[in-house]
């Protein structure tokens, strides 16, 4: 069975990837605060092995507030206030999954360890400046991640929320994977169709119908 090193190891040797790492390193060296911390940039791949991926939830770029981002899309450290988008995800879960209790924290490692790849399309951000690293080359890398999952795995669930995530639809073969789309869970758009999308129960129904263990969404 392939692992992350097999499928994207060579990508890390590409000039564009080295350039992205170098730009982030320079920014840190020049005293800028970059999130997440250096040792947590690739946490999505640390917590969810390639062969264990069942579900992919795409985010855009990391949270840009202090102590929030730790390398998993939508997730924050246990002691940090739950951000609005994640709070709306929890609200949908309380309606969608029988018995789901509103969590007291936003630390989603439990999802990641069950095979939910929480992948931001851009892996770093400067403090207080959303999308500040959007042009560093990270998206080329994360597009490759999506492409290799599409190619080398079968029957994954891709949750694409909002227009940015939905641009990645073209990288996914819908005859071999389940793609679910909805507006972004942010307070600006959640009421336009994220609430009531039932993506969490639909994900579990698909997994179970294909002989896989459902995700325990409770945090």
Curated annotation (Swiss-Prot):
Q: Can you state which reaction this protein catalyses?
A: Hydrolyzes single-stranded DNA or mismatched double-stranded DNA and polynucleotides, releasing free uracil
| GO cellular component terms listed in the entry, alphabetical order | cytoplasm
Q: Where is the active site?
A: 61
EC number(s): the record gives: 3.2.2.27
- Which pairs of positions does the record mark as disulfide bonds? none
Instruction: Identify the enzyme class.
Output: hydrolase
DNA damage is among the record's keywords: yes
One Gene Ontology term from the biological process aspect of the record:
base-excision repair, AP site formation via deaminated base removal
Q: Which GO terms label this protein's molecular function in UniProt?
A: uracil DNA N-glycosylase activity
What CDD domains has UniProt attached to this entry?
UDG-F1-like
Kindly state which keywords UniProt assigns to this record, in alphabetical order: Cytoplasm, DNA damage, DNA repair, Hydrolase
Question: Function, please?
Answer: Excises uracil residues from the DNA which can arise as a result of misincorporation of dUMP residues by DNA polymerase or due to deamination of cytosine.
The similarity annotation says:
Belongs to the uracil-DNA glycosylase (UDG) superfamily. UNG family.
Question: Cross-referenced HAMAP family, in alphabetical order?
Answer: UDG (MF_00148)
The protein's name is Uracil-DNA glycosylase
What is the name of the gene encoding this protein? ung
């Amino acid at each position: 069975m392939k692992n992350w090193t097999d499928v994207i190891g060579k990508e890390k040797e590409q000039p564009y990837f080295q350039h992205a790492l170098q730009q982030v390193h320079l920014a840190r060296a020049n005293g800028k605060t970059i999130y997440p911390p250096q040792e947590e940039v690739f946490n999505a791949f640390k917590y969810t092995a390639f062969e264990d991926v069942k579900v992919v939830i795409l985010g855009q770029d990391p949270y840009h507030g202090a102590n929030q981002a730790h390398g998993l899309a939508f997730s924050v450290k246990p002691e940090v206030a739950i951000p609005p988008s994640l709070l709306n995800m929890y609200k949908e879960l309380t309606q969608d999954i029988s018995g789901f209790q509103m969590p007291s924290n936003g630390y989603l490692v439990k999802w990641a360890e069950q095979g939910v790849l929480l992948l931001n399309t851009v892996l770093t951000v400067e403090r207080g400046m959303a999308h500040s690293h959007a042009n560093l080359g990270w998206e080329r890398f994360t597009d490759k991640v999506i492409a290799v999952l599409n190619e080398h795995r079968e029957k994954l669930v891709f949750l694409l929320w909002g227009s940015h995530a939905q641009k990645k639809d073209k990288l996914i073969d819908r005859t071999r994977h389940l793609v679910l789309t909805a507006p972004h869970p942010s307070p600006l758009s959640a009421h336009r169709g994220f609430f009531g999308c039932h993506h969490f129960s639909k994900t579990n129904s698909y997994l179970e119908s294909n002989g896989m263990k459902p995700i325990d969404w409770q945090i």
